[in-house]
């Protein structure tokens, strides 16, 4: 039986606030490894009935808004709050496994997935956990050389005692402003990862903080000093943003002391992520691209800037805006977008930013937006789903939204 100690005190009583996949992983772990009493608060009404002073530790789901009532009360008990990652770290800290944490507004999922892929392709045992979808505690019991962790700003806010071997921040742009007072507060929450990392670097092309090590991008290729390492056409990816992602991965591998030339061969095999700038197919001369994972303004700007050099995109935009600043995409809309179909719960909010800067139409839902876009699109044009929004007003998540888009493309092809 594993005994969890915190500040040299054995933990016997814990309150769990929220019970999603992360909360369930904590419960399952505690039931199997630790002799401890656990109370679970699954909603606002239950939460107010618990005496927070009576618990040794409190775990909080990353989805719980600490800036809103009644959960503001938790901010008085920060010393008691630990995350599932903290508990995971306590379990593995005496092993030889290396932990790598990556955060950022855009690109972090690609970076952690590519890093995990390369490590495995090089023959190491690697696990991929965190915000990418698999709770870390679900991997307890597995043997591994490396643990690659995608972390969100919400998760970092809950960290207490974890120490990553390497932390990195990439591409911070405005997001989740419904949970933060302003962009500076959101950015600082990301930078706090440094407090929990033994080694740390930032690669942020949006804010002028670009640590690239010995690497640089020249005309669609990555160079190390004056030696060309990789051209984008040698990979299964496209766009300068993916060259930037590759540079981050190379810096991670450099700091781990691994062979970069072997890593380049592995990177060439990496196929990218589902729902991230994926060409679905061409129907009646129109190319359909699924970028459902573009859940904020910065992600959609990156997609627009990487897909074409012409003003031939018909864009599907909308969902839950999360307080995003859509004025930031006006330059890219003007340069690359022929028409925008806006849908979702925050369509009027989005309209208020782009009105007068591009041609657009408001739609009832994504299906209607797709149908209208398909009717308007001509040969050699692109219908792009890159919503710049969360999906929870209409879908269970970005993956379901992307699957629905792909199904609509398949149905259109059958009718053609």
Swiss-Prot record:
Keywords: ATP-binding, Cell cycle, Cell division, Cell shape, Cell wall biogenesis/degradation, Cytoplasm, Ligase, Nucleotide-binding, Peptidoglycan synthesis
Annotated Pfam families: Mur_ligase_C, Mur_ligase_M
Gene3D superfamilies xref list: Mur ligase, C-terminal domain, Mur-like, catalytic domain
GO CC annotations on file: cytoplasm
Residues annotated for ATP binding in this entry: 104-110
Protein's recorded name: UDP-N-acetylmuramoylalanine--D-glutamate ligase
ATP-binding as UniProt keyword: yes
Compartment list: Cytoplasm
GO molecular function: ATP binding; UDP-N-acetylmuramoylalanine-D-glutamate ligase activity
Family per similarity comment: Belongs to the MurCDEF family.
Top-level enzyme category: ligase
Statement: the UniProt record of this protein carries the keyword DNA damage: no
InterPro entries per the UniProt record, alphabetical: Mur-like_cat_sf, Mur_ligase_C, Mur_ligase_C_dom_sf, Mur_ligase_cen, MurD
Recorded catalytic activity of this chain's protein: UDP-N-acetyl-alpha-D-muramoyl-L-alanine + D-glutamate + ATP = UDP-N-acetyl-alpha-D-muramoyl-L-alanyl-D-glutamate + ADP + phosphate + H(+)
Pathway(s) it belongs to: Cell wall biogenesis; peptidoglycan biosynthesis
Enzyme Commission number, as recorded: 6.3.2.9
SUPFAM superfamilies: MurD-like peptide ligases, catalytic domain, MurD-like peptide ligases, peptide-binding domain
Purpose of the protein: Cell wall formation. Catalyzes the addition of glutamate to the nucleotide precursor UDP-N-acetylmuramoyl-L-alanine (UMA).
Predominant subcellular localization, coarse grouping: cytoplasm
BP terms from Gene Ontology: cell division; cell wall organization; peptidoglycan biosynthetic process; regulation of cell shape
């Amino acid at each position: 039986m594993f005994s969890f100690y915190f500040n040299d005190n054995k933990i016997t009583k814990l309150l769990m606030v929220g019970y999603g996949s992360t909360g369930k992983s904590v419960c399952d772990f505690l039931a199997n490894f630790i002799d401890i009493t656990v109370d679970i608060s699954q909603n606002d009404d239950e939460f107010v009935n618990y005496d927070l002073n009576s618990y040794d530790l409190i775990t909080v789901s990353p989805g719980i808004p600490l800036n809103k009532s009644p959960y503001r009360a938790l901010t008085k008990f920060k010393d008691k709050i630990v995350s599932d990652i903290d508990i995971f770290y306590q379990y593995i800290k005496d092993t030889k496994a290396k932990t790598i944490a990556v955060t950022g507004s855009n690109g972090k999922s690609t970076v952690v997935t590519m890093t995990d892929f390369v490590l495995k392709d090089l023959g190491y045992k690697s696990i991929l956990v965190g915000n990418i979808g698999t709770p870390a505690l679900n991997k307890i019991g597995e043997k591994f050389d490396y643990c690659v962790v995608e972390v969100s700003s919400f998760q970092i806010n809950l960290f207490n005692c974890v120490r990553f071997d390497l932390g990195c921040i990439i591409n911070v742009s405005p997001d989740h402003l419904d949970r933060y007072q302003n962009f500076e507060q959101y950015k600082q929450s990301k930078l706090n990862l440094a407090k929990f990392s033994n080694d740390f670097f930032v690669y942020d092309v949006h804010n002028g903080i670009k640590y690239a090590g010995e690497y640089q991008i020249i005309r669609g290729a990555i160079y190390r000093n004056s030696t060309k390492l990789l051209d984008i056409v040698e990979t299964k990816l496209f766009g300068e943003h993916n060259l930037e992602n590759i540079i981050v991965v190379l810096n991670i591998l450099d700091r781990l002391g691994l062979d970069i030339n072997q890593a380049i061969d592995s990177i060439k095999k990496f196929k990218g992520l589902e729902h991230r700038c994926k060409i679905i197919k061409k129907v009646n001369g129109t190319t359909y691209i699924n970028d459902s994972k573009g859940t904020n303004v910065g992600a959609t700007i990156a997609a627009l800037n990487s897909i074409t050099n012409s003003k031939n995109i018909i864009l599907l935009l909308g969902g839950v805006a999360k307080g995003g600043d859509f004025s930031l995409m006006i330059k890219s809309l003007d340069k690359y977008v022929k028409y925008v179909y806006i849908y979702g719960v925050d369509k009027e909010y989005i309209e208020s930013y782009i009105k007068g800067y591009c041609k657009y139409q408001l739609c009832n839902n994504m299906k209607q937006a797709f149908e209208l876009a398909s009717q308007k699109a001509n040969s050699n044009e692109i219908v792009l789903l890159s919503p710049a929004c969360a999906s929870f007003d209409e879908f269970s998540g970005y993956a379901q939204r992307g699957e629905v888009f792909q199904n609509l493309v398949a149905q259109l092809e059958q009718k053609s």
